[in-house]
Amino acid sequence: MNTNSEQVLDQKSRPLRDLRISVTDRCNLRCTYCMPAEIFGQDYPFLPKGELLSFEELERLAKLFVHQFGVEKIRLTGGEPLMRKDMPELVGKLAGIKGIRDIAMTTNGVLLPVYADKLKKAGLKRVTVSLDSLDDERFKSINGRGVSVSKVLAGIEAAKKAGLGVKINMVVQKGVNEKDILPMARYFKEKGHILRFIEFMDVGNTNEWNRQSVVAKADIIRIINEDMPIEPIDPNYEGEVAKRYRYLDGSGEIGFISSVSDAFCTTCNRARLSAKGELFTCLFASSGFDLRTLIRSGQTDQELAEAIGTVWRNRDDQYSLDRALAKAVPRKKVEMSYIGG
């Protein structure tokens, strides 16, 4: 933690440690659980360029989160972050902020062959690549654009060659790709990349989520354990979202992100900044706090920091826990493509 920063706790005594920055709401894929093509079509009102925070505005806010509140990790998300022009330039600006330990990016991997080297040289540490199947036809159906698995695998290889750390995320949906659990586990075990299985979540309003479509963490663990024995291991750090497991044969590890069956709200230390400068304190939020207007109206760094601190101190989100207890009130939620995963 930055020794000059303030320890800011929310209503449930959770610190602010992790900032996720969505740099665009656009994507070159149309995955059914995130940006279904029938809704995010040609006429969808994506954010115009003038509404996006500039790189200079993003750098200014990032410095405040790091220096004033002790944020140590920044993850760049979207949409697809590499759809935003000149991303290595932004990475370079963020990497120059004293106090940041880790800069990562979540991407679908398609554009990594073009950008991986430049991103690494600019200061990016690692990427998390989304891939939901190794079956080409199934993956083409899921991504809504007919993009082949080979395009993503090429991106993963480009990232590895560039020296970036690589993890893979797979969203598992019953009746869609649960058959791919073992093939994915075997493939990335052999490749030496950590694969994380993510329970299908009710983020946004357009992915037709229902609990019957969720393949729970316990079921995924059972499927893998019967074929390749695994055991739980300690988290890398306090508040780590993925539950870590290792293969008993010593050939690596996998992870499980279980927002539905085993909520992790009690240790969530993440803030999310949307592409247009709204601050969100939960992935399942209905609305955010408008920082862009404050920036563009001439607010000082101190005034911005006070606003951010007030938002975090008032935070009491625990949507996934409330959902598990059947206490979550139905509401319109912000789309994942807007806020970042």
UniProtKB/Swiss-Prot annotation:
Annotated positions binding S-adenosyl-L-methionine: Y33, G79, S130, M201
Reaction catalyzed: GTP + AH2 + S-adenosyl-L-methionine = (8S)-3',8-cyclo-7,8-dihydroguanosine 5'-triphosphate + 5'-deoxyadenosine + L-methionine + A + H(+)
Cofactor note: Binds 2 [4Fe-4S] clusters. Binds 1 [4Fe-4S] cluster coordinated with 3 cysteines and an exchangeable S-adenosyl-L-methionine and 1 [4Fe-4S] cluster coordinated with 3 cysteines and the GTP-derived substrate.
Any single Pfam family the record assigns to this protein: Mob_synth_C
Residues annotated to bind GTP: R20, R75, T106, K167, R270, A271, R272
Cofactor (UniProt): [4Fe-4S] cluster
SUPFAM superfamilies: Radical SAM enzymes
Its EC number(s): 4.1.99.22
Subunit structure: Monomer and homodimer.
Protein's name in the database: GTP 3',8-cyclase
Species: Bacillus licheniformis (strain ATCC 14580 / DSM 13 / JCM 2505 / CCUG 7422 / NBRC 12200 / NCIMB 9375 / NCTC 10341 / NRRL NRS-1264 / Gibson 46)
